Amino acid sequence: MGLYRIRVSTGSSLCAGSNNQVQLWLVGQHGEAAIRTRLRPTRGQETEIKADVQEYLGPLLFVKLHKRHFFQDDAWFCNWIWVQGPGPSGDEFRFPCYRWVEGSGILSLPEGTGRTLGDDPQGLFKQHREQELKDRRRLYRWGNWKDGLILNMAGATISDLPIDERFLEDKKIYFEASLAKGLADLAIKDSLNVLTCWNDLDDFNRIFWCGQSKLAEKVRDSWKEDALFGYQFLNGANPMLLRRSKQLPARLVFPPGMEELKVQLEKELQLQLPRVGSSPPPLFLPTDPPMVWLLAKCWVRSADFQMHELQSHLLRGHLMAEVITVATMRCLPSIHPVFKLIIPHLRYTLEINLRARTGLVSDMGVFDQVVSTGGGGHVELLQRAGAFLTYRSFCPPDDLADRGLLGVKSSFYAQDALRLWEILARYVQGIVHLHYKTDEAVRDDLELQSWCAEITEVGLLGAQDRGFPNSLQSRDQLRHFLTMCIFTCTGQHSSAHLGQLDWYSWVPNAPCTMRMPPPTTKDATLGTVMATLPNFHQASLQMSIVWQLGHRQPMMVALGQHQEEYFSGPGPKAVLKELRKELDALEKDIKTRNAKLDIPYDYLLPSLVENSVAI
């Protein structure tokens, strides 16, 4: 009994407010009270009301919302609700929402303390969490885009996605406007150059966008140099391919009379472009004629382009994050501490992935139009790559050890990935230890075990044989698994995404397609190179897509800088504060190192790492 102060926060994005009236109920452990005053939410505003409650409520458990509409349902984006009372000395309660409120049903928001099933011995939240998961499983259904690939969210269009998974209006408008700009520029360039000759490497300058990236301009000027060619495999757009070789690859076949080259392999780089069913091709050497050696390197870079975009970027970044997202929404209620920890790192993933499936890798999409592996090859490559989705490969300490890159001083990706992993692991451990006091508490959490099994057995199609756990037995194992999930959705995706504009804008450095077969002789000329590299339209489309995906987004949220507060209480806030402190220290260290480098490596700079797979 007494006076309660209630503050309601509405989102700041376009259309977040509502013309509909909203009624509230306070639900306590001992009673429930309807708030007579109705509010009309205003975009970007906090609305405060006071209510004199006659009933004794006890500690508050829920706030219930009911949005009334007469003619039109006007959706409302609610950030949170704060309640203080009874009286000026009463307790404060925070009820996170961060979702759209639509329709005429009643929405119940639990108080923001993270609670496992074991934290609710009286079962006060049991019915709520069961009903929430039941509703979510109807909304979030597994789909199968292509046989043999890890599963995805069911749905063919944006409208098939739950409203809370779609872009907010601000991001949607910017994304679609920038896409339209890129396609318009492509059309203009195509029309202006339709009759011009395309017979010299300098002609690629016609479609190169200056002023977008200093590194891209350096690549344009220096791409023929062997040092830059090799550097890219350590710290370029795709740092996931390189591994230390302790013996010659079995696929490296020496043509008759060239066996003596084996002893020279330790001294200089050599390339071989094998063709299935054909006799061994020649080994291409830096001492070959310039155009011969350049063409061989272009083939290697084009192959890396395919592996990067499909395996490292799409599969290991986007699609893996989608599995984590769908499993989380199906298995963890919003009151669960693991849900609260991971949900900021799943924002926008389902829509950006759906756009990729319907625009980039769909039938007659970008890959089919201009990429070598289009027309079905990209699907086969993804299917084959699925066999390499091992648990260790998603964890940098294990992956870098397996690839022999630990301690390689020139691998800035390795250095930064390890430090970022360790920072995230400490952050995760802080939250885990707040909510799980023993290993037994982890083992007994049925919702947590269901979530882990859903990822490994369902989304990843039974990945136990590749090292993924299908149950979690200890706090350390939970910490490691959660760190893998968050690092995949943040740092790992960033390392595969941010380099596209820098390294792929100059098309000859990373051709999306090669129009002639791999060379079998050493008589290549400039004409051969130009006939093999992408034509004008293909190169223009590559440049346009690279800009669309690679340029910095104005509403980007940096790692750990999300404004949403899903947790209540001082403990989680202190853990997040420590994360931000450690990220700031890493930021300073990377900038200090980069100041001494000819080519700075900033793809894991915390201020540039997106908080989720959102682009």
Short names for language-model regions:
Residues M1-I615:
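Long, compositionally biased charged/polar stretches
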